[in-house]
């Protein structure tokens, strides 16, 4: 069992259960599930109805959220990845707090698309409880998605929106 530091015996399993429950209540989120399984959860996935989730029209017909929180050894805080995935366009936009890309600071926003170069920018660091981070990032996601520019079917993130 993994306990998250400074989180009053908050386990990774408990955290993912709370993320799952939070997404089940989120407008536009459907078929919320654990991956790889309920017995061994590592992240939470939800299919998304983009216009309902974003509150306006969206070019995406389908999307999903992939959310992972974990607590690595020898680190005194949680890592996370909150990714918006549009499989039909091979597009991923996510907020990450992990050991990758240290030059960008503790958090970054990342855009991935097929074989194009990945866009990354430093993002606002949130030193909060993981569920507060989840809520804040979910609120920031529509603004981040609006900042993406599409040219001839290729997305770019010209500046950091958050």
What is the meaning of each model-derived region?
Residues 69-82, 133-139:
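Hydrophobic transmembrane alpha-helix bundles
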Residues 36-39, 87, 102, 115, ...:
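Solvent-exposed, non-transmembrane amphipathic alpha-helical segments
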Residues 1-68, 73-77, 158-161:
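Negatively charged, low-complexity tracts enriched in Asp/Glu with abundant Ser/Thr
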Residues 1-10, 18, 57-66, 95-102, ...:
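Acidic, Ser/Thr/Gly/Pro-rich low-complexity intrinsically disordered regions
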Residues 78-131:
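An exposed acidic His-Trp-rich patch
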């Amino acid at each position: 069992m993994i306990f998250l530091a400074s989180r009053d015996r908050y386990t990774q399993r408990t955290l993912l259960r709370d993320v799952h429950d939070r997404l089940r209540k989120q407008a536009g989120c459907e078929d919320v599930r654990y991956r790889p399984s309920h017995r061994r959860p590592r992240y939470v996935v939800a299919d998304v109805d983009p216009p309902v989730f974003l509150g306006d029209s969206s070019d995406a017909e389908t999307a999903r959220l992939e959310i992972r929180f974990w607590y690595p050894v020898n680190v005194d805080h949680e890592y996370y990845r909150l990714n918006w995935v549009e499989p039909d366009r091979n597009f991923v936009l996510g907020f990450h707090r992990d050991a990758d890309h240290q030059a960008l600071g503790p958090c970054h926003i990342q855009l991935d698309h097929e074989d194009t170069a990945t866009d990354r920018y430093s993002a606002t660091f949130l030193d909060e409880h993981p569920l507060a981070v989840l809520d804040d990032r979910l609120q920031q996601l529509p603004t981040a998605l609006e900042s993406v520019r599409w040219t001839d079917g290729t997305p770019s993130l010209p500046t950091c929106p958050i």
